[in-house]
Amino acid sequence: MDSQPSWTHVHEQNRKAWDRLVDQRNRFARPASDQDCHDPLAAVDGLGWLGGNIEGKELLCLAAGGGRQSAIYASAGARVTVVDISPGMLELDREVARERRLDIHVVEASMDDLRGLTAQSFDIVIHPVSTCYVPDVVKVFQQVARVLKGGGVYISQHKSPVSLQATIKPGDAGYVIQSPYYSKQAVPKVSGTSLREEGCLEFVHRWEEIIGGMCRCGFVIEDLVEPMHAKPESPRGEFGHRAQFIAPYLRIKARRREQAVTPSSDSNHGELWLPQ
């Protein structure tokens, strides 16, 4: 089977951007700490969505290079594979695996093209905030559905659509919507903010695409939260101030259906897509 990714200009630009962010020691390019690995599930699963024990589970860290996610889940006893588009980010995973003597399988690929991974081979997929870097989020969900076992858990995080649409700094009228909701174009680039990754192309995904797309790809959503980052005392225009008005991201717990479910006759979306 051909395992080479199908690069587009979006993939290539974001790949290069993340390699630069590694060189700049971006906050997402910092490997797990001793404290993280000492009590790993406390570091990443405060909501208890993983049930308190992942020993021996086949776990995919998707679009999650950087040496943190993979090391934490491997320290918790999971058999970890980490996928990322950036060679620089993946090198951090290799380094932390050597330093901590962890068994971590590293794969360079895009989240929307996992042809190099075996179907139904994972019990858990962990997917940090990253779907904004691909134009079509449904392709990502299709790939996850293919590699996840029936009954498997998919925990993902996504930038809020309105957060990507809105201005980073407030004007006289406060934070305003500047990018259209129905658009396939990348949002305007900005710099100097933790809400965006400099040099990357990012795309707004509608709620229908995130929630509906996930359901139509064979998942049942079990929980959804918007982590609280609002800080009333934050100066105007700072991250905590903006978060009072706009949730920066959401976290979803979904489970892969064991069997196909036939869509209702009044569905406007055609047949349910099922992984092969």
Predicted regions and their residues:
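Conserved class I S-adenosyl-L-methionine
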Residues: 153-189
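A short acidic, Gly/Pro-enriched loop at the edge of an enzyme's catalytic core
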Residues: 112-125
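Class I SAM-dependent methyltransferase SAM/SAH-binding core
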Residues: 57-114
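N-terminal, positively charged/glycine-rich alpha-helical extensions of SAM-dependent methyltransferases
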Residues: 1-32
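A short glycine-rich, Lys/Arg-flanked "PGG" loop and its adjoining helix->strand segment in the class I
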Residues: 138-153
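A short SAM/SAH-binding and catalytic strip from SAM-dependent methyltransferases
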Residues: 123-138
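Short alpha-helix
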Residues: 201-225
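Conserved alpha-helix/loop element of class I SAM-dependent methyltransferases that forms part
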Residues: 30-57
